[in-house]
Amino acid sequence: MEREVRVLSLHFTPYTMEGALTRAQALIEAGGCARVYTPNAEIALRAARTPAFSDMLARAELLLPDGVGVSLAARLYGEQLPRLTGIDFAEALLARAPRRYRVYLLGGKAGVAVRAGRALAGRYPRAEIVGARHGYFPREEERRVYDEITAARPDLLFVCLGSPRQEEWIERLRPPCLSIGLGGALDVWAGDKARAPRALRQAGGEWLFRLLQDPSRIVRAGALPAFALRVLLDRWHNHAKCRGSV
């Protein structure tokens, strides 16, 4: 059984990038519905507060720690958990594909997914973009969107609807391929938003770069101190429980 690292209510297998890619490639070749979710601190906090959402994430075949906050929290539990951002993982999956992968892109505003698809096809020769659709559709159109996607027979479905909508959509529809929740990745690939410089990303400062790009994220940034406090309280509670059982 693979070792797991707990951060609040979530349990991660501490994969390296190579290990995560190997696991994902095996899921693709196995066929059928499989899910990759990429929780950051905000998503992990929501999971801790919402048991149903936590259970949803736990059903993923692959759970990757996207934010530096999750990896730092693991250290407070005395564990090492390599950070694997969703966008880096998706790009590596396309770059190292052992064969041509059929890819469908779902999310973003009108035109964003199409432009992102062109960019990905130009960068990754083994990425065959078989469909691209914006993410602004009502709940009653979900089945039609699902039918469009399944008709394209993708190996990979990048679902960029934002959390928790993207995870809930994947769980309700269960597309018969490897679905990856990727938040705002399409905006980056389409060229509408820039990623932080590599040095800043490696230093764990990508969240600050995003905040400077989009000051409206300040409301969401409030989840970071709340997450840190929740982790500290959880660690203290577990420590006190262990001492009490001695």
Where are these regions (language model features)?
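N-terminal nucleotide/polyanion-binding subdomain common to many enzyme families
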Residues: 1-88
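Structural motif
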Residues: 36-38, 64, 104, 156-160, ...
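Short glycine-rich anion-binding loops that position phosphate/pyrophosphate groups of nucleotides
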Residues: 40-43, 161-166, 185-186
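A short, gly/pro- and small-residue-rich
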Residues: 51-59, 167-188
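Conserved beta-alpha
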Residues: 71-148, 152
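A transmembrane-helix-recognition feature enriched in membrane-embedded lipid enzymes
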Residues: 71-72, 195-246
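Short, flexible loop segments at boundaries between secondary-structure elements
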Residues: 134-138, 177-213
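Proline-aspartate-enriched helix->loop->beta-strand connector
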Residues: 149-163
